[in-house]
Curated annotation (Swiss-Prot):
Gene that specifies this protein: KRT9
PROSITE patterns (alphabetical): IF_ROD_2 (PS51842)
Region (Linker 1) location: 173-191
Task performed by this protein: May serve an important special function either in the mature palmar and plantar skin tissue or in the morphogenetic program of the formation of these tissues. Plays a role in keratin filament assembly.
Note: There are two types of cytoskeletal and microfibrillar keratin, I (acidic) and II (neutral to basic) (40-55 and 56-70 kDa, respectively).
Sequence segments annotated as region (Tail): 446-760
Domain of life assignment: Eukaryota
Region of interest: Coil 1B: 192-283
Residue ranges of the region described as Coil 2: 307-445
Region called Coil 1A, residue ranges: 137-172
Compositional bias segments (type: Gly residues): 460-657, 664-761
Protein name: Keratin, type I cytoskeletal 9
Domain IF rod as annotated: residue spans: 137-449
Region (Disordered): 1-21, 447-786
Amino acid sequence: MNCRQFLSSHCSRDSSGGGGGSKMFSCNRSSFSGASGGGGRFSSSRSFGGGSSGACGRGGGGSFGSSYGGGSGGGFSAGSFGGHSRGFSGGSGGGFGGGFGGGFGGFSGGSGGGFGGPGGFGSGFDSGAGGILGADEKTTMQDLNSRLASYLDKVQALEDANKELESKIREWYDKQGSRTFHRDYSPYYDTIEDLKNQIVNITADNNKTLLDLDNTRMTLDDIRMKCDIENNLRLAVNADINGLRKVLDDLTMQKSDLEMHYESLQEELIALKKNHEDEMSQLTGQNSGDVNVEMNAAPGRDLTKILNDMREEYERISAKNRKDIEEQYETQMSQMEQEVMSSGQEMESNHKEVTQLRHSIQEMEIELQSQLSKKSALEKSLEDTKNHYCGQLQQLQEQIRSLEGQITEIRGEIECQNQEYSLLLNIKTRLEQEIKTYRSLLEGGQEDFESHESGQSHFGSGGSRQQGGIGGSHGRGSRGGSGGSYGGGSSSGGGSGGSHGGGSGGSYGGGSSSGGGSGGRGGSGGSYGGGSGSGGGSSGSYGGGSSSGGGSGGSHGGGSGGSYGGGSSSGGGSGGRGGSGGSYGGGSGSGGGRGGGCEEGSGSGGRSGGSYGGGSGSGGGSSCSYGGGSSSGGGSGGSYGGGSSSGGGSGGKGGSGCSYSGGSSSGGGSGGSYGGGSSSGRGSGGRGGSAGSYGGGSGSGGGRGGGCEEGSGSGGRSGGSYGGGSGSGGRSGGSYGGGSGSGGGSGGSYGGGSGSKGGSGRSSQVQSSSSKSGECDDTQGYHIQY
């Protein structure tokens, strides 16, 4: 349930009287609630604020719509509560009981169907005879009692629903709390432990594999190093072999030389032996002749001995050379072996040192790899932990956001229910005031009728004229005379305040009078809820009316009549020179403008109308709205949501009002909206004024006023809406919860009113009903004495 649906249910009633009821809260230009059937005492009709010719139609009717509580035969009946037709002429009033049909009176040449129009309690009081309520007093009061009982039943039902909702909220919090803070994660512990063990085992296997790879790499490096060493040794041995091969070649050359020398010596020896044999043979041959020759000669050399000596000498030289060569070779070989051994030892020591260094490097690399692996594993573990906790944190944040959203929804529902409850309390208060007002009307009605002249017109209508025309409904007055309405009347021509006899009369919710008189120059016709007269005259509707031409049921300088939901007045008259009528939701009109409906109201030429939720006054006057409102210095009135104005101070220059939530305006004034609003300068919407709407809105400078969803106004003026309204330029209209007058007068509204500058508004035992925090006493009995 939201506020819009509740307001719709407020406009309907599931009584046993018929099938009337609203379907939805549809604020458009032609209807306020859904279609209805006939028969319901408080069922909504086709239009809550729209008339038979539209909410603010030029053609006629339609200020309050076709009915307040029902269609044909239901609620407050069809008809126009504040409707007019083109400048007050030919207008018709609204009905009160179910199926009353006709209005309470017509305006300026128009005639109403009386109190018992078609479908009502007879043919009507067309010729001016009959009482206020006639024989149907008990029926009317019983209807009001049944309405009050239905409201009390609704209040009780809403309280029960509120308690049930609170219990559901507590249960929900208990469930959500236990679900959130006692969640069991124990089934996941084993899985988490297994995953951790798997991670540790896989990490250990990876480290072992890395160590095996490092060991294999080290073994490969050792083998490669040994291979390099063997290659170096092989190259060194090859170099030694090459060096020894050179020595061997030298020795071979020497050997070949010696062999050649030996061969030459052998040949020489052979040649010598051969020569020796030849010589021996020659000598032997000579001896064979027995020739002896003796000579005394020196002895010859012994060649054999010489040869032998030479041979021995050469052999000795050869042996010596061989020995020297062998010694030299052995010496060189020993030196080379020593050098090779020393270089081998150095190489071996260097190799060992290199091997040790390589082992140390490999160990350090292995340790570095293990540390890096450990670091990466720790980083991965840290990242996994962060991701895990981030996911948990995100889940918790989502849960918190969802809970906050649910809390916000619940708070909104509770706030909406509080507003509904406050609205019901306000309705109950208004019903109490309505019952008191009815009682006072019943008690004082007969006296008012007896005090009037016999030539007074009937209750539902009165013709108006200029230059001494007829007075209001229930009395006439002209040029000093006075005409009062049922709730009051107005007088002019220097008359005095008070109801009938030249005084001033209030509307149903209040009225105003002035020293210069109201209803001047032709007087005015009042309405059941109040009215005003002017030079051309007009009559109000059930909720009120307006006047113009310098005189009205308001003040001398001008006045206004409130409507059921509100009306408007101004220094030159609200609805002046063509005038306007207020509507249940509020409306305004001026300069031949149009009357406002529940859906919207519009006015021009410096006029404004109040609204259901509030109204405004200016020019030294103040008004309060349903939720409160204030005006000053041509300021503006508040709306249901509240509003305030300035320009002479909040509540300055004569008075102030309060708003439901608060708002402000200044300069030419403005109207607040349901939640409050503000304007400044020459007014929100410009040129002196603005109009508030249920949802908020403003109009100015020929703009459009506010309806149920918006308001319209022109010429620097504004029209009120269901949620609020405002007046500017020294003009203001009353609203359902309050009203105000300005420019020397004020117009009363159903909930009350005020006037200033020589005029005051009067209500009949009416209190301004604002938001009430107290509880509704459902056990209180409401018994009405008939």
